[in-house]
Curated annotation (Swiss-Prot):
<feature type="compositionally biased region" description="Basic and acidic residues">
    <location>
        <begin position="1557"/>
        <end position="1572"/>
    </location>
</feature>
<dbReference type="GO" id="GO:0030426">
    <property type="term" value="C:growth cone"/>
</dbReference>
<dbReference type="InterPro" id="IPR043537">
    <property type="entry name" value="Tiam1/Tiam2/Sif"/>
</dbReference>
<dbReference type="InterPro" id="IPR040655">
    <property type="entry name" value="TIAM1_CC-Ex"/>
</dbReference>
<dbReference type="GO" id="GO:0030175">
    <property type="term" value="C:filopodium"/>
</dbReference>
<dbReference type="Pfam" id="PF00621">
    <property type="entry name" value="RhoGEF"/>
</dbReference>
<dbReference type="InterPro" id="IPR001849">
    <property type="entry name" value="PH_domain"/>
</dbReference>
<feature type="region of interest" description="Disordered">
    <location>
        <begin position="174"/>
        <end position="249"/>
    </location>
</feature>
<feature type="compositionally biased region" description="Basic and acidic residues">
    <location>
        <begin position="395"/>
        <end position="411"/>
    </location>
</feature>
<feature type="domain" description="PH 2">
    <location>
        <begin position="1347"/>
        <end position="1478"/>
    </location>
</feature>
<dbReference type="InterPro" id="IPR036034">
    <property type="entry name" value="PDZ_sf"/>
</dbReference>
<feature type="compositionally biased region" description="Polar residues">
    <location>
        <begin position="218"/>
        <end position="229"/>
    </location>
</feature>
<dbReference type="GO" id="GO:0030027">
    <property type="term" value="C:lamellipodium"/>
</dbReference>
<feature type="modified residue" description="Phosphothreonine">
    <location>
        <position position="1662"/>
    </location>
</feature>
<feature type="modified residue" description="Phosphoserine">
    <location>
        <position position="1604"/>
    </location>
</feature>
<feature type="domain" description="DH">
    <location>
        <begin position="1120"/>
        <end position="1314"/>
    </location>
</feature>
<keyword id="KW-0597">Phosphoprotein</keyword>
Length: 1715
């Protein structure tokens, strides 16, 4: 029924007139329920100011059918009358058009919760209005005082009759329960009548949602049995809405006995007061409807009544709606349906106090037909209510005999057992306070105490009288008013939190609940100490779970907040089928780091909850992103996360590779920190990906993703943390990931709050974080401020505090998951700390929140009478049984530090004298200064030192502090004096060796005049001191401000405005300029101010992080571009210098030593010579690009950088494939580690390394040098990305740079691919090289940098040793520059089927997956086209090993078949190109490839054009239309691979690592010309068919063009004769011929412009013409060449024809002499 309840009082109570304030309720003999002491209110505290909250009485047994209550939790009645209920037959569906006043028979449901009002049948005109609702009462018109106590000790029976099937009419009759043969005391002749209520939409009294449905509309009214039918049964504490589904609850027509007080049998004689509408025949029909306790509870409730005499009784209507509270639809409305059931006959029962309709737990026979009908109609409501089935109850209810435990949310409950109350008192509630939880008694034989009985009708009248009298005492209780206003205020906060997302109720039902994991202090996950299952009515509104103690609330209880609320934002819900004791358990983890367990009623209900919560989270996620298409957004996020995972995985792998060769502890620590950060990033990305897939599954109806892939991504530290926690699951992992997020802390501060007069305790999880906001750089309120502003506390997933009206004491927060930190955490954060000194002494200091590290150091030193500048402070922390030391920066706050001990240590002080000699222009170090407002220096720090400079040799190191200059203390100098001293030829410094801070914590500045670079990170100063000086001076000229109040908060670097503001105050600019022009070192300061970014792990040039974006307030877009470009060039210079040092220090001396073998040398330095030469060329192109832009330093808009950006982007596009040289070096890095391990055991090797690095600097070690190429190649995409971000997205240069960025990212992918291949097959490659027969190995090493192509082919003629039954064995073909390797790797699935006698060609263990491996050196390799006899397959080809000795034959033929003809074409071309290359090399020098590579260390003399032939998209289009034969600058080269090796359209083949796709795109006629030039040098007899096959032959679909091999040879001999005449001088000294002939520049890669398809293949006549034209170009007069250069530069930004580089990156003239 409705929301009315009666407050039962004990008759004869000693305190029947008043209640002692604050007295605790004595517990009853049974654990009826737990009542909070703070729930007891004053008797006189009830006024209309309660905002309609009223007192809240709760049913003892929640056998409620009515789910129409909105919010209000109910308190149990401790005493009350006996009542008997007759059950009606059917429910009616609400209909807006139902007539208002007609009774349709006697089978309509006249429910008080539907808005029916109680009317005495004597006078319908006599009524009162309370809160605007009609209330008419009869027979009891006297006031509260006129009701004599104890007038009738018998509780009346309440008979409820359904008067109509469809229109919802009901009659309630009151009968005296003591004598069944006697009518009611007021009207023996008839029952009390109810006023007819019309459930229309226009009803002004009850705007309850229409969720009723016909349950048995077709049942005749004659099916109703008598209310005293013997089939009435008692219940053992069950509740339909909480225990069973609608369709499986066998409700009988028994009078239902209270769970708490027990049942008392009564005579079974028929009630004489039954009206004639109940015929005797009704007794044989089953019920279609039952009246639930909640329905009766509505009958006995008054929201405005506060006190009553114990002797009186009150009854209130359910429709007292406070005029101050609007309708609240927050809670889901479950349907009030029951199931018709047929029950066995048994003796009727007496009704005692607390007796209300309940059902017995006895299994009953049901009418199958009726039940099935209802099942079909009601099944859809079962999930909505979420009720537990009857048969699951015993299994699932935790510790059912201790009901008060699972629902008692406070510690002061009524928990005494076996006690009969010695005294009685009325429990009084204030608005919003009576939120204790319901409780079930497990016995039907509860004790009945006679004085507890009351007259329900008298209660009803008392409540009416009290409600009238309360209107006169509104102003009498200020405490009540205060409480009421606070309730309203809390309600407003509640509405703000929940209505802001316009959430709707998605799901509601009963759930058992307990917290599992919570986030404690120091962001630690801990298991919740107090873990008991509790049951709540849970509604999912929006993305928030609201927990109520009872269900089905309506608008009467709007201001009654939910018991708790849980934000489910970004949550993950997972089923927990492995729970040891319970079924249908699921786990919810939210973004706040909390984990909760829930138990649903069934598996279906569980799945519905999971889907509902995930769908709500997905909806909120889409709203946050402003998207309407949630599915599309989630898919987009999924793709983005996959890309991030891929990128971070690669970066982490490279960092691990770097870590393996670094031995310096500090650098290792930095790398490990970076790896740990990448691991955490990957975990977060994997978690977000899993979450997105969960949301997608909920929206699309799919299965949830498998958590195995997520848990596999857990890093080792995370596994250890979860192992300590004892819970390794998706939910705990999610909580761990969320606990690292700073936003988690902010989210935890948002919650449902209720106003309290004083501050509550803050969660212990927030200890130490309260004053976080006082750091100047973070502009967000502190936790304390947040609470102070709302005057309240409350947190996610926690029980809300309650406010007592008669007590001003602050109430403790009762928390799920963490104890209360009851100590008030105000802004005064002070800690007593003992500080140690190295002399085993120490002092105790008080550290305040505003103290920085330097403040504590100064305080400690002052106490010990020491000089603070000569001491440092370090922190000791114990982590996993190891001790970590950390030196924080002086400007960091002590409150932010995590430590176990503080130690002060002395700094080393030493003097250095630096003197410049010869043409030395500077000392080689940079400084940063701290100045005061008078331009006097406070401190000077060394910000950078060049490695080979005078300063470095003198012992200066980054981070040292200069305390005196030439004997003058720094504090006595100003800027001009400092500049003058640094400009002298000699300077004496007193230095304090201050350690570099070990972490980079962002912080606020020291002071307004602080110039110290926070991170102490800077780029090396540029060698061009004059440019720096000009920029430095410009800074002083442009900016003149000393107002620091407008300086924005800075997240990194230092405030440049401070520098400008202080330095600009120096007068006499002309004099200042003269001083600065003579101070070379001060120019370094500018670089340090502008460039504060370097790698914390290695040399300052190699950082994996993108350069920081300068502050918009200080740098324009042009300045940013200039800064990034300058950084690119500067770091490139430093990198080339490092590579040169590697050669000078290690490579060249090692060649003269004997402790490394040739193979080990190859491993260490395999492709480094080529890499160095290439990097020199690349550096020249970058420098030329900048030098060509003479106004680079004065460009003011990004558009003016257009030409320069095209040149830079073109350089990257042109050389993209050259960077693939790094793939071999990176893949071989595993070998490098093995070689360097020898230094630990080989004393000679170790002595050599020590001699190379006498100062023991890690940056000068061999490991450090060998890791620099790995770092550098990963740096390029980051710099390009920064350039791309600074250009206009619609501009051509933006597109151009984007293409360059893509090319470099492909390089990184290629390097990773090569590493993967080496990991899989490197062992095979090394083994094949080692197993070569013969005294001198033809192939000494196979470098991944020389891998040109790999492909999978079918082997058509496998060896017999592999088994005759094997068909189409899959071979992997690896084409290297020096050899071709065939490998058969057996599939693991096929191992079992392999015959026992099968062995690979090379005998190996059965466990070896490589069943066949074969190496064919390039000198013994032939390739043959053609189909196998009798087949039409044109994808077959043959590899021939000509010098094979197997099976007694001179050659071994491998018949292979590719997947398609295109793949065949690609691989055959690559093999032929290496054959031709080997042939030419043999002609020229007859040296093996590896020897020529080692000798080729001559630097390149010419370089690529600045623009790399890519000017703009317009010229790109123009070039695409031009014929390749008209391209003037494509001479062939003599020592590189042929062009059909398929270099990228924008790259070269120098790396030897082309990709198949580009192979098919890049076709040219220069292959034939190259082949002809090479063949001309050989006699006929030495020429093989496989060596002279042209591209026409390769294009096997067409017949041979005109000409023959003989004719080709004749042509070559003619050319050879001409070449001999010109080749008079040795290489490198050829003078110009009379015709001005230039040395030929060879080039193996092509212009990045793709030719048209019809211009790729030409006949031999065309080749001869092209050859003649090329020769004529070479012999052109110089003026003609200049004219052509001008045309090229104007049209294509090509500076000269001679600035083309061959494929290997070397300058070589064509040598045509005889070998």
């Amino acid at each position: 029924m409705g929301n009315s309840e009666s407050q039962y009082t004990f008759q004869g109570s000693k305190n029947h007139s008043n209640t002692v304030t604050g007295a605790k309720q004595k517990p009853c003999s049974l654990k009826i329920r737990s009542v909070h002491a703070k729930d007891e209110k004053s008797l006189h505290g009830w006024t209309h100011g309660s905002s309609g909250a009223g007192y809240k009485s709760r049913s003892l047994a929640r056998s409620c059918l009515s789910h129409f209550k909105n919010h209000q939790p109910y308190a149990t009645r401790l005493s009350g009358p006996t009542c008997k209920v007759s059950k009606g037959t059917t429910y009616s569906k609400h209909r807006a058009n139902t007539p208002g006043n007609d009774f349709q028979g006697n089978s309509g449901a006249f429910l008080p919760e539907n808005g029916f009002h109680y009317v005495d049948r004597e006078s319908e005109e006599s009524h009162i209005t309370s809160n605007g609702h009609l209330l008419t009462c009869y027979g009891r018109k006297e006031s509260l005082a006129s009701t004599p106590p104890g007038e009738d000790h018998r509780s009346p029976r309440v008979l409820i009759k359904t008067l109509g099937k469809l229109d919802g009419c009901l009659r309630v009759e009151f009968h005296n329960g003591g004598n069944p043969h006697k009518g009611t005391s007021e009207d023996p002749s008839g029952p009390v009548r109810l006023l007819r209520y019309s459930p229309t939409l226009a009803s002004e009294t009850c705007p309850v949602r229409e969720t009723r449905r016909h349950s048995a509309a077709g049942s005749p009214s004659s099916q109703r049995p008598s209310p005293t039918d013997s089939r009435l049964r008692s219940s053992k504490g069950s509740s339909l809405s909480s225990e069973s589904s609608w369709y499986d609850s066998p409700w009988g027509n028994a009078g239902e006995v209270s769970e708490v007080e027990g049942s008392f049998l009564a005579p079974s004689t028929p009630d004489p007061s039954l009206p004639s509408s109940f015929p005797p025949s009704d007794t044989k029909k089953p019920f279609n409807q039952s009246s639930s306790l909640s329905s009766l509870r509505e009958l006995y409730k008054d929201p405005n009544l506060g006190c009553r005499s114990p002797s009186g009784t009150c009854l209130s209507s359910n429709e007292y709606i406070s005029s101050q509270v609007s309708l609240n639809n927050r809670v889901s409305f479950a349907s009030d349906m029951d199931v018709p059931s047929r029950v066995d006959h048994r003796d009727p029962l007496h009704y005692s106090s607390f007796t209300l309709p309940c059902r017995k737990s006895k299994a009953l026979t049901e009418d199958a037909a009726k039940k099935d009908t209802l099942k079909a109609r009601m099944r859809r409501f079962s999930d909505w209510t979420g009720s537990l089935s009857r048969k699951k109850r015993k299994l699932q209810e935790p510790r059912s005999m201790e009901g008060s435990e699972y629902f008692d949310s406070h510690s002061d409950g009524l928990n005494a057992e076996g006690q009969v109350p010695a005294q009685t008192s009325s429990l009084l509630w204030s608005g919003g306070s009576a939120q204790t939880l319901p409780h079930r008694s497990e016995s039907t034989h509860a004790i009945s105490v006679d004085p507890l009985r009351q007259n329900i009708y008298e209660n009803f009248m008392r409540e009416l009288e009290m409600s009238r009298s309360n209107t006169e005492h509104v102003e009498t209780s200020t405490e009540t008013m205060e409480s009421s206003s606070e309730s309203v205020s809390s309600l407003e906060q509640l509405d703000l939190l929940f209505e802001k997302e316009q959430g709707v109720v998605r799901k509601a039902g009963w759930l058992f609940f307990k917290p599992l994991v919570t986030l404690q202090k120091e962001r630690k996950l801990e298991l919740v100490a107090r873990r008991k299952w509790k049951q709540y009515w849970v509604t999912l509104k929006g993305c928030t779970l609201l927990f109520y103690e009872t269900y089905g609330k309506n608008s009467t209880e709007q201001n009654s907040a939910p018991r708790c609320a849980l934000f489910a934002e970004d949550s993950i819900v997972q089923s927990v089928p492995e729970h040891p004791k319970k079924e249908h358990v699921f786990c919810l983890s939210n973004s706040c780091g909390d984990v909760y367990l829930f138990q649903a009623t069934s598996q279906t209900d569980l799945e519905n909850w999971v889907t509902a919560i995930h769908s709500a989270c997905a909806s909120l996620f889409a709203k946050k992103h402003g998207k309407e298409d949630t599915v599309r957004l989630l898919k987009s996020q999924t793709r983005s996360l996959l890309q991030k995972i891929d990128m971070d995985s690669k970066m982490k792998k490279m960092a691990e590779l770097q870590l393996s060769v670094v031995s310096d502890p500090k650098n290792r620590k930095a790398i490990e920190n970076q790896i740990r950060q990448w691991e955490q990033n990957l975990e977060k990305f994997h978690m977000d990906l899993f979450r997105m897939r969960c949301y997608l599954a909920s929206l699309q109806g799919g299965e949830l993703p498998n958590p195995k892939s997520l848990l596999a991504a857990t890093s080792r530290p995370s596994k250890l943390a979860l192992g300590r926690l004892g819970v390794l699951s998706v939910s705990s992992f999610h909580a761990l990931v969320c606990s690292r997020d700073d936003s988690t802390l902010r989210k935890r501060t948002l919650s449902l709050t209720q106003r309290g007069k004083s501050k509550k305790g803050i969660f212990s999880s927030l200890k130490g974080l309260d004053t976080l906001a006082r750091k100047g750089r973070e502009k967000r309120a502190s936790i304390t401020q947040m609470f102070d502003s709302s005057h309240s506390h409350g947190f996610l997933g926690t029980q809300l505090p309650q406010k007592s009206t008669n007590s001003n004491k602050a109430h403790d927060l009762h928390l799920y998951g963490s104890a209360v930190d009851s100590a008030l955490r105000d802004s005064m954060w002070e800690v007593q700390t003992y500080v140690h000194f190295q002399d085993n002494e120490g002092v105790t200091v008080t550290i305040k929140p505003e103290h920085r590290v330097e403040d504590v150091l100064a305080l400690v030193c002052k106490m010990r009478q020491l000089e603070p500048t000569h001491y440092g402070l370090q922190l000791r922390k114990v982590v996993d049984k190891s001790v970590e030391w950390c030196v924080p920066a002086l400007y960091e706050y002590m409150q932010e530090q995590v430590y176990d001990e503080i130690e002060v240590f002395p700094l080393s002080v030493y003097d250095v004298q630096l003197t410049k000699t010869g043409d030395m222009t500077d000392f080689g170090f940079a400084v940063t200064v701290q100045v005061d407002e008078h331009q006097h220096l406070n401190r000077i720090f060394i910000s950078d030192v060049l490695p080979d400079s005078l300063a470095y040799g003198g012992g200066l190191r980054k981070g040292n502090e200069i305390t005196s200059l030439n004997g003058e203390p720094v504090s006595d100098l100003d800027i001009q004096q400092m500049e003058a001293l640094f400009s002298e030829k000699s300077v004496g410094l007193t230095l304090v060796a201050r350690p570099v801070t070990t972490r980079r914590t962002l912080c606020a500045s020291w002071s307004d005049s602080d110039l110290f670079s926070r991170d102490q990170k800077s780029l090396p100063p540029s060698p061009n001191q004059s440019q720096l000086l000009e920029e430095f001076l410009d800074n002083f000229r442009k900016t003149a401000t000393s107002d620091f109040s407008n300086v924005p908060e800075i997240t990194t670097g230092l405030k440049r405005s401070q520098t400008e503001g202080t330095l600009d105050q120096v007068p006499h600019r002309e004099k200042m300029e003269q001083t600065f022009l003579s101070a070379d070192q001060i120019a370094e300061l500018c670089r340090d101010l502008n460039n504060t970014h370097t790698n914390s792990m290695e040399a300052p040039t190699e950082s994996h992080d993108p350069p920081p974006r300068p502050l918009a307030r200080h740098l324009s877009d042009a300045d940013r571009l200039r800064k990034v470009i300058q950084e690119l060039v500067d770091t490139e210079k430093s990198y080339v210098k490092d590579l040169s040092c590697l050669f000078e220090l290690y490579l060249e001396p090692l060649q003269n030593e004997t402790f490394l073998t040739q193979d080990e040398m190859e491993s260490l330095f395999g492709s480094l010579p080529e890499m160095l030469e290439f990097q020199k060329v690349f550096l020249e192109t970058l420098e030329d690009a900048i030098s060509a832009s003479s106004d680079f330093s004065v460009l003011e808009t990004p558009s003016q950088f257009r030409k320069l950006l095209f040149s830079l982007g073109g350089s990257f596009l042109y050389y993209a494939d050259h960077f693939k040289l790094y793939s071999g070096f990176c893949a071989n890095h595993i070998k490098v580690q093995r070689v360097l391990e020898r230094a630990k055991t080989d004393k000679a090797f170790k002595a050599f390394l020590d001699a190379r690095n006498p100062t023991k600097q890690h940056s000068s070690t061999l490991e450090s040098y060998l890791i620099k190429p790995v770092q550098r190649v990963l740096k390029y995409p980051l710099l390009l990305k920064e350039l791309v971000s600074l250009t206009d997205h619609e501009s051509e240069e933006h597109y151009h740079l984007t293409e360059a960025l893509k090319a470099m990212e492909k390089v990184a992918s290629h390097i990773n691919e090569m590493q993967k291949i080496y990991e899989d097959y490197g062992m095979v490659f090394d083994q094949l090289v080692a197993e070569q027969s013969g005294t001198e190995k033809e192939v000494t090493e196979l470098s991944m940098g020389e891998l040109l192509m790999h492909s999978t082919v079918s082997w058509l003629n496998p060896f017999l040793s592999l088994g005759k039954a094997r068909k189409d064995i899959e071979l992997t073909v690896f084409v290297f520059k020096r050899a071709v390797i065939l490998v058969y790797k057996e599939n693991c699935k096929l191992k079992k089927k392999l015959p026992s006698n099968s062995r690979p060609a090379h005998n190996s263990a059965d466990l070896d997956p490589f069943k066949f491996r074969w190496l064919i050196p390039i000198s013994a390799l032939q390739v043959r086209l053609g189909n196998t006899a009798g087949t039409e397959n044109n994808s077959t080809w043959e590899l021939i090993h000509t010098k094979s000795e197997i099976e007694g034959r001179p050659e071994t033929i491998f018949q292979l078949c590719c997947s398609d003809s295109e793949n065949k074409t690609s691989i055959v071309k690559v093999i032929r190109s290496i054959l031709r290359e080997n042939f030419r090399r043999h002609i020229k020098c007859e040296l093996p490839l590896e020897k020529t590579c080692k000798d080729r260390l001559v630097p390149l003399k010419n370089r690529v054009p600045v623009s790399a032939k890519l000017a703009s998209s317009r010229s790109l289009k123009g070039l695409r239309t031009s014929s390749s034969s008209e391209w003037p600058s494509e001479p062939s080269k003599g020592n590189s691979l042929d062009s059909d090796e398929c270099s990228l359209s924008s790259g070269t083949q120098s790396s030897g690592c082309p990709v198949a796709e580009s192979r098919r795109d890049s076709k040219s006629t220069e292959l034939e010309k190259d082949a002809q030039e090479g063949l001309a040098e050989f006699p006929d007899g030495l020429i093989k068919e496989s060596d002279i096959l042209s591209d026409e032959d390769e294009d096997f679909h067409h017949p041979l063009k005109q000409g023959s091999p003989t004719k080709d040879i004749e042509i070559q001999f003619q050319r050879l004769k001409i070449s001999e005449e010109s080749d008079v001088h040795p290489v490198g000294q050829q003078p110009l011929t009379e015709s001005g002939e230039q040395p030929k520049l060879v080039r193996g890669h092509f212009c990045p412009i793709k030719r048209k398809a019809n211009s790729t293949k030409r006949g031999r006549g065309t080749l001869l013409k092209a050859q003649t034209r090329h020769q004529s170009l070479d012999s052109h007069p110089e003026t003609a060449s200049i004219d052509l250069n001008l045309v090229l530069e104007r049209e294509f930004s090509v500076q000269s024809l001679t600035s083309v580089v061959n494929e290997e990156g070397f300058y070589e003239t064509q040598s045509h002499g005889k070998s």
